[in-house]
Amino acid sequence: LIQNAVLRANRYMSALQEQRYIEGTNILEPEAFRSLVKAYLHAREKQLTECTLIQIISSDLTREEAGQKLAKLMRQSDYVGVFEDGRIYALLANTSAKDAQLVEKRFREEGFQCEIQEDIAV
């Protein structure tokens, strides 16, 4: 059931391929990102996968530059997106909160202020 939710989210993302990214960036639009995060959080609740969400609090870079730089610091299975609040988040698939601390450290070393989000409503 959870796997189906993730598959549905991925199909949804594929169907909206041209509309899912903020123009000129590799950052997922709020609706597409929210759908993906919901699927991963639901799967995590059912103990089918691990995932961690990191909020990027601030950076001296433009959103486009931040997205490009973050993508280079993450795996291909991870995602960069925004919610309606306009803030950038990184969704780390198959990553526990403990393991995400290493990614958070890497982000900080590259000039990003960030914070692991334990409880987030989507």
Description of each model-found segment:
Residues 71, 101-113:
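Alpha-helical scaffold within the catalytic cores of cyclic-nucleotide enzymes
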Residues 52, 78-93, 110-122:
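A short glycine-enriched loop-to-beta-strand structural element that forms part of the catalytic core
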Residues 60, 67-101:
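Conserved helix-loop-beta segment at the catalytic/binding core of cyclic-nucleotide signaling proteins
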Residues 47-60:
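Short glycine-/aliphatic-rich beta-strand segments at the starts of folded cytosolic domains
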Residues 6-10, 44, 111:
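Conserved NTP-handling cores and scaffolds of large molecular machines
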